[in-house]
């Protein structure tokens, strides 16, 4: 089930990472699993979740449920971003910039999953610093959520959209 998509209503789900963890006790080790998943509708809503359990399927299901509860709205400009955006979480830094139509998603593993499920089709993206998938996903979603549409910016500044767009 690694890196595959499933339909859950109108939501697409993607498994980003499954990690085996161990708790050391007097009698030996107790193994458990953590799962990182991303959920999106492909048209501007995306979320991520982490699940922990003793069995892989249970961890994945918990992560999917959490991802559905933690969705954010992303302001897109057609199939790309409104403007270049930077974000960081921990030691992971991400930079995403709009790309012309037909470019595709040029981004690394964990970032690619988030961008695909958010509905972005053309973007140039780069991850700097730590490439820990959890922090990269968090930074990517933080950056996407921080974007504002030109209409919102114009309303806040008391200007017209044409003045903002230049």
From Swiss-Prot:
PROSITE patterns: RIBOSOMAL_S5, S5_DSRBD. It comes from the Bacteria. GO terms for biological process: translation. Residues 11-74 form the S5 DRBM domain. It holds the Pfam family Ribosomal_S5. SUPFAM superfamilies: dsRNA-binding domain-like, Ribosomal protein S5 domain 2-like. InterPro entries: Ribosomal_Su5_D2-typ_SF, Ribosomal_uS5, Ribosomal_uS5_bac-type, Ribosomal_uS5_C, Ribosomal_uS5_N, Ribosomal_uS5_N_CS, Ribsml_uS5_D2-typ_fold_subgr. With S4 and S12 plays an important role in translational accuracy. Located at the back of the 30S subunit body where it stabilizes the conformation of the head with respect to the body. Part of the 30S ribosomal subunit. Contacts proteins S4 and S8. This is Small ribosomal subunit protein uS5. The gene is rpsE.
């Amino acid at each position: 089930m690694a890196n595959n998509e499933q339909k859950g209503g109108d939501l697409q789900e993607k498994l980003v990472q499954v990690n085996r963890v161990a708790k050391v006790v007097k009698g030996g080790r107790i193994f458990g699993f953590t799962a990182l998943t991303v959920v999106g509708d492909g048209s501007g809503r995306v979320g991520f979740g982490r699940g922990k359990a003793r069995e892989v399927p249970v961890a994945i299901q918990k992560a999917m449920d959490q991802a559905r509860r933690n969705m954010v709205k992303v302001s897109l400009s057609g199939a790309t971003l409104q403007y270049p955006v930077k974000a960081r979480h921990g030691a992971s830094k991400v930079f995403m910039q709009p790309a012309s139509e037909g470019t595709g998603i040029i981004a690394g593993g964990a970032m690619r999953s988030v961008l695909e499920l958010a509905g972005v089709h053309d973007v140039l993206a780069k991850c700097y610093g730590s490439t820990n998938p959890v922090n990269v996903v968090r930074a990517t979603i933080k950056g996407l959520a921080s974007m504002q549409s030109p209409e919102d910016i114009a309303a806040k500044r008391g200007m017209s959209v044409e003045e903002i767009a230049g």
